[in-house]
Amino acid sequence: MRTLLALAALAGFAAARVPAYAITRPVMRSDSRADAVKEAFSHAWDGYYNYAFPHDELHPISNGYGDSRNHWGASAVDALSTAIMMRNATIVNQILDHIAAVDYSKTNAMVSLFETTIRYLAGMISGYDLLKGPAAGLVDDSRVDVLLEQSQNLAEVLKFAFDTPSGVPYNMINITSGGNDGATTNGLAVTGTLVLEWTRLSDLTGNDEYARLSQRAEDYLLHPEPAQYEPFPGLIGSAVNIADGKLANGHISWNGGADSYYEYLIKMYVYDPERFGLYRDRWVAAAESSINHLASHPSTRPDVTFLATYNEEHQLGLTSQHLTCFDGGSFLLGGTLLDRQDFVDFGLDLVAGCHETYNSTLTGIGPEQFSWDPNGVPDSQKELFERAGFYINSGQYILRPEVIESFYYAWRVTGDGTYREWVWNAFTNINKYCRTATGFAGLENVNAANGGGRIDNQESFMFAEVLKYSFLTFAPEDDWQVQKGSGNTFVYNTEAHPFKVYTPQ
């Protein structure tokens, strides 16, 4: 059931918010809501396994299947870490059987280095870390080593992507021919969202090549050139030249295409503060610049906070995305880790802004893209803009996790049960509007009755992210739960796969 907050009440909440560090630590216990999320996961898995396995994703309306991720069973690999956390040994064993049989050297599709890294490589590495660590004994230990073996096999297949004059990789590659799509640039997020996975693989295998490849590419982003494409400290352009590693533009945002570069800067410091102090420094610079230069408040709702974009003409763009709503969680993680209350407070403001995009629609689910530019409000959305401070550019919902993700971080950092309720409301609405007889479908328009029709696709990140963060919010305390301060023993990749933080041998 959707919770409706009056605008005055929301403003009052923002004004009277208790400082994060004054709130008691979350009390962890078994919760029937965790069981409800487990049921949703099993429902989605059963539909996928019965109608689409071993293909990449289920079409949950027609009960067909898709192979958008190399034909290697993306949903199965992406589901592994969540199934482990839920301690569902049956599903974990089904996935281990599948992974052992995959030949990562064979596909007829062009392969995305980025998507393959964050879903397949990360899913297997995370499964290994969990089953060799806090979930040891869930399945026969002799079955676990294949995860690391297959991770290394996959990395060996993919690593030629880095064979460029600069070391900045191609993203779209042909693993059969050893070719690529001929691109001259790579995206900021694509280039900057490989280092956690490839470094972890090196640390587990003792082969430092994987870390060197990813960190060489990242180094161009940590020392960006030319200076004009870093208009504010830490905030850099959204594309990188493959030939020389120089930035190709000065388009600044936390939106898709740039987002997870910033996400990984602070997460690399969580992973190993000894090696990745520069990553922390660059994240701090970006965070401070974002507060000073990108923070934006709709004219009709000055209590709401979003992050704007910035272009080469020195203009702010008042458009954001569901993808961008990870930003609150990033500020919260960095703020609690570095004992920066200003980052925590700003993160909570961003979380509240993204909550508004959920709380204000007919379905209680947020849109793919939204804006708060007062000069572009469609006549049909003037009431929404006046009431909520945003209007919708793209009303689709394709089972994205970022809003729930940031709610989860807010709960873990503050201990304030409000954020648990926000997670529950979001999960309940997804379960209501997206659930089909065999899984979960996307929505055409979150601000139309019944979601404006359904999209016949169940993305693998429904398993990896939406259901994981929903479950973790209500699950008992465990090693993999996000912690306040510097107490994290796991750090999550951008697909919500937890890696064990580095500990020197």
From Swiss-Prot:
Record InterPro entries: 6hp_glycosidase-like_sf, Glyco_hydro_47, Glycosyl_Hydrolase_47, Seven-hairpin_glycosidases
Molecular function in Gene Ontology: calcium ion binding; mannosyl-oligosaccharide 1,2-alpha-mannosidase activity
Keywords for this protein: Carbohydrate metabolism, Cytoplasmic vesicle, Disulfide bond, Glycoprotein, Glycosidase, Hydrolase, Metal-binding, Signal
Note on how the cofactor is bound: Ca(2+). Can also use Mg(2+), but with lower efficiency.
UniProt keyword Oxidoreductase, yes or no: no
Active site: E368
Catalysed reactions, as listed in the record: N(4)-(alpha-D-Man-(1->2)-alpha-D-Man-(1->2)-alpha-D-Man-(1->3)-[alpha-D-Man-(1->2)-alpha-D-Man-(1->3)-[alpha-D-Man-(1->2)-alpha-D-Man-(1->6)]-alpha-D-Man-(1->6)]-beta-D-Man-(1->4)-beta-D-GlcNAc-(1->4)-beta-D-GlcNAc)-L-asparaginyl-[protein] (N-glucan mannose isomer 9A1,2,3B1,2,3) + 4 H2O = N(4)-(alpha-D-Man-(1->3)-[alpha-D-Man-(1->3)-[alpha-D-Man-(1->6)]-alpha-D-Man-(1->6)]-beta-D-Man-(1->4)-beta-D-GlcNAc-(1->4)-beta-D-GlcNAc)-L-asparaginyl-[protein] (N-glucan mannose isomer 5A1,2) + 4 beta-D-mannose; N(4)-(alpha-D-Man-(1->2)-alpha-D-Man-(1->2)-alpha-D-Man-(1->3)-[alpha-D-Man-(1->3)-[alpha-D-Man-(1->2)-alpha-D-Man-(1->6)]-alpha-D-Man-(1->6)]-beta-D-Man-(1->4)-beta-D-GlcNAc-(1->4)-beta-D-GlcNAc)-L-asparaginyl-[protein] (N-glucan mannose isomer 8A1,2,3B1,3) + 3 H2O = N(4)-(alpha-D-Man-(1->3)-[alpha-D-Man-(1->3)-[alpha-D-Man-(1->6)]-alpha-D-Man-(1->6)]-beta-D-Man-(1->4)-beta-D-GlcNAc-(1->4)-beta-D-GlcNAc)-L-asparaginyl-[protein] (N-glucan mannose isomer 5A1,2) + 3 beta-D-mannose
Cellular component terms per the entry's GO annotation: cytoplasmic vesicle lumen; endoplasmic reticulum; membrane
Pfam families xref list: Glyco_hydro_47 (PF01532)
Pathway(s) annotated for this protein in UniProt: Protein modification; protein glycosylation
Function: Involved in the maturation of Asn-linked oligosaccharides. Progressively trims alpha-1,2-linked mannose residues from Man(9)GlcNAc(2) to produce Man(5)GlcNAc(2).
EC number: 3.2.1.113
Name assigned to this protein: Mannosyl-oligosaccharide alpha-1,2-mannosidase 1B
Entry-linked Gene3D superfamilies: 1.50.10.10
Cellular compartment(s): Cytoplasmic vesicle lumen
Signal sequence annotation: 1-16
Major subcellular location class: cytoplasm
Complex and partners: Monomer.
Keyword Calcium: no
UniProt family annotation: Belongs to the glycosyl hydrolase 47 family.
An annotated GO BP: ERAD pathway
Disulfide bonds: C325-C354
Gene name per UniProt: mns1B
Glycosylation sites: N88, N174, N359
Annotated residues for binding of Ca(2+): T494
